[in-house]
Amino acid sequence: HPFIEKDTSPANEYEGLTHQMNRRHRSLTRQIIQFDVEFPNPFIQEKLMIGAEQPVYNIHRLRILDNEPYILEHTFMPVHLVPGLKKAHLLSSIYDYLHQDLNLHFAGAYRAISADKSTHFDQEYLNCSEIDPVLDVQQVVYLKDGQPIEYSSSRNRFDVRNYSLLDVRSN
């Protein structure tokens, strides 16, 4: 099977990419493309269940695995739920900051996985061509109290990553 040659991640995994790759003894680094605080547009307001005047972090990062472009992430997080987020956290692990420093814990996530045509941004940062498809994983992550803490879109090259899901039927 050709997918065996790709990195496969469980679709229901919540530890984050840093922990996944540390377990596999892989070198994961990050490049910050954008890190701003802004007011959310109506789409982000709906996804994060916040008002128009509640600021969010707007984060664009390139995840680099073993010195190769791996995932292009665009993440929004409400500032009031993630106070004190700094570039140092973006360069290490945002999820470690949430779990260890802020004592926040996830209840689950809604994920939508689809194929898409590569954008100019994908081509620039993931080194793919304009005819290469990308795997787009959009997710909303929820805290245990039900509040959405993250909306993100992760763009993956078609030839380097996929996701698996074990679907067990219950009677």
Label each region the model flagged.
Residues 71-72, 151:
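Short glycine-/small-residue motifs
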Residues 1-52, 82-92, 97-107, 162-171:
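HTH-adjacent hinge/linker in prokaryotic transcriptional regulators
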Residues 52-66, 134-142:
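A short beta-strand signature
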Residues 77-78:
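GIY-YIG-like beta-to-alpha core
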Residues 46-49, 60, 124-126:
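A generic local secondary-structure boundary/capping motif
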Residues 145-171:
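C-terminal effector-binding regulatory domain of bacterial HTH transcription factors
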Residues 112-144, 148-155:
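Extended hydrophobic
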